[in-house]
Amino acid sequence: MNDKTIWITGASTGIGRALAIKFAKNGWNVAASARRENLLKELEELNQDIYSFPLDVTDKEKCKEVFKKIEDKFKTIDISFFSTGTWDPGKEKEIDVEQIENVMKVNFFGTLNCIKSVEKYYRYKKSGHISIVSSIAGYRGLPNSTGYGPSKSALNNLAESLFFDFKRYGVRVSLISPGFIKT
């Protein structure tokens, strides 16, 4: 095993998957989490330094359990990269409160569940990095984004607040807001 470890949520596709591959190639232990276990297994087969930890981020207790398993396996987590997200533009042609609640549950509360699971660890460790993936959709309204945009806007505000809360413990918090990525 390597000296450095990164935990990546949303690791089965897109930015999370690409990052998992890159960090593993650079000699890091990669704890890869996502809902789709079959895609995690495919990712795991690409590099011996990628380890799958299936997770539905909307389950608070499961987030805590998965974090504990990662900590037990690697003993240290240097970076937590939370890139879980969902968007279904086909369902946003009309305001659908249930669909918006689901997007908020995954994008905002799912990320918050993961942050809560690492909070005490990083505060005690007094070092580390929490990275939150948002979107340009969090800065201005876009068509068919009645759920997605507000969920990312909430992440922006959360990251900005956590920046100050964790800074006093020597823990970095960063916000990444990419444009559209074909996944």
Roles of regions detected by a PLM:
Residues 91-92, 96-104:
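Substrate-binding pocket helix/loop in short-chain dehydrogenase/reductase
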Residues 12-13:
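Conserved glycine-rich cofactor-binding loop
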Residues 135:
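Residue(s) in the substrate-gating loop at a strand-loop-helix junction
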Residues 93, 140-146:
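Active-site loop immediately N-terminal to the catalytic Tyr-X3-Lys motif
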Residues 120, 164-165:
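Alpha-helical segment proximal to the catalytic Tyr-Lys
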Residues 26-42:
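Conserved glycine-rich Rossmann-like NAD(P)H-binding loop of the short-chain dehydrogenase/reductase
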